[in-house]
C-alpha cells in the first residue's frame, strides 16, 4: 500500500481505499509513519488513550516526534507523568509547546482568569495557536480520538481531512472502547495519570477539569457547568 494522501491531494475515494486496507491500530501506525516519515507528529495529552498510543508507537518508531500542549495550567500529576514517560521511552523526542503569551501577559491583555470568563479564547491562545504554528511544517498528525468518547466524535475515521489545520489527521484508536484502553494499560503495566483513579476520565487544564459526575460520559468533567465540551482542536 503505497498511496500517499495529503490535504492538497485529498479525495474521498482514495481515503476510503486506504482505510479499507488498514486492519487495526498497528497497521494504521505502520502505514502512517511509512507514508509521512518526519512529516508526522503525535499530539499527546498524556491521558489514558495517550499512554496506549505511546506504547503502540514505540513498537513502530522508537524515535517518534511527540508534542504536548503545555498551557501552564495542567495538573502536577500530568507533568510528573510526562517525566515518567521520558524515562520509559528514552528515544521519543517529546517537545513541550508553550503559548506565545505567559499567563501574566495573557492576564494583562485579556483580564485575569480568562478560562472563567472566556474559555474559548483561553483555549485558542494556549492550545490551538501553538499547535497550529507547529503543525504548519507537518503533513499529518496523530490523535487518540475514539468514536465512543462523545457524540461529536462518532464519525471519525482512521484517516481524516483536518480542515482546521489543513493536513491529514490519523486516528488509530477509533474502534477502541474505554474498557479496551484500560485493559491494554493493565495488561502492559503502563504508567498513567493517577487522577484517573480519582474519577477523572478526561484530564485537561486544572482550572477546567473536575471529576466526572457521569460514569457513562467520559468528558462530563471538562468545562463543567458550561456548554463548552471541546477545546477546539478537533472542531472544524
UniProtKB/Swiss-Prot annotation:
Coiled coil: none
Binding site for [4Fe-4S] cluster: 122-123, 205, 208
Keyword check for Chaperone: no
Listed GO MF terms: 4 iron, 4 sulfur cluster binding; adenylyl-sulfate reductase (thioredoxin) activity; metal ion binding; phosphoadenylyl-sulfate reductase (thioredoxin) activity
InterPro entries per record: APS_reductase, PAPS/APS_Rdtase, PAPS_reduct_dom, Rossmann-like_a/b/a_fold
A Pfam family the protein falls into: PAPS_reduct
Active site: 231 (nucleophile)
Region: Disordered, residue numbers: 216-236
CC annotations in GO: cytoplasm
Protein name from the UniProt record: Adenosine 5'-phosphosulfate reductase 2
Gene name in the database record: cysH1
Amino acid at each position: 500500500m503505497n498511496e500517499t494522501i495529503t490535504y492538497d491531494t485529498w479525495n474521498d475515494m482514495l481515503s476510503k481505499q486506504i482505510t479499507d486496507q488498514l486492519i487495526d491500530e498497528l497497521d494504521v501506525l505502520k502505514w502512517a509513519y511509512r507514508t509521512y516519515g518526519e512529516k508526522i507528529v503525535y499530539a499527546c495529552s498524556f491521558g489514558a488513550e495517550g499512554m496506549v498510543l505511546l506504547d503502540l508507537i514505540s513498537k513502530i518508531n522508537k524515535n517518534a516526534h511527540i508534542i504536548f500542549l503545555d498551557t501552564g495550567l495542567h495538573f502536577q500529576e500530568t507533568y510528573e507523568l510526562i517525566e515518567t514517560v521520558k524515562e520509559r521511552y528514552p528515544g521519543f523526542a517529546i517537545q513541550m509547546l508553550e503559548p506565545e503569551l505567559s499567563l501574566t501577559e495573557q492576564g494583562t491583555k485579556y483580564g485575569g482568569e480568562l478560562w472563567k470568563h472566556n474559555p474559548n479564547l483561553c483555549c485558542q491562545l494556549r492550545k490551538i495557536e501553538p499547535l497550529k504554528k507547529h503543525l504548519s511544517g507537518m503533513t499529518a498528525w496523530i490523535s487518540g480520538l475514539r468514536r465512543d468518547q462523545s457524540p461529536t466524535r462518532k464519525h471519525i475515521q482512521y484517516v481524516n481531512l483536518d480542515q482546521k489545520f489543513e493536513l491529514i489527521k490519523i486516528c488509530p484508536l477509533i474502534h477502541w472502547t474505554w474498557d479496551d484502553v484500560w485493559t491494554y494499560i493493565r495488561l502492559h503495566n503502563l504508567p498513567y495519570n493517577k487522577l484517573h483513579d480519582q474519577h477523572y476520565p478526561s484530564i485537561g487544564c486544572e482550572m477546567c477539569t473536575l471529576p466526572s459526575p457521569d460514569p457513562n460520559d467520559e468528558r462530563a468533567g471538562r468545562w463543567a457547568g458550561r456548554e463548552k465540551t471541546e477545546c477546539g482542536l478537533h472542531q472544524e
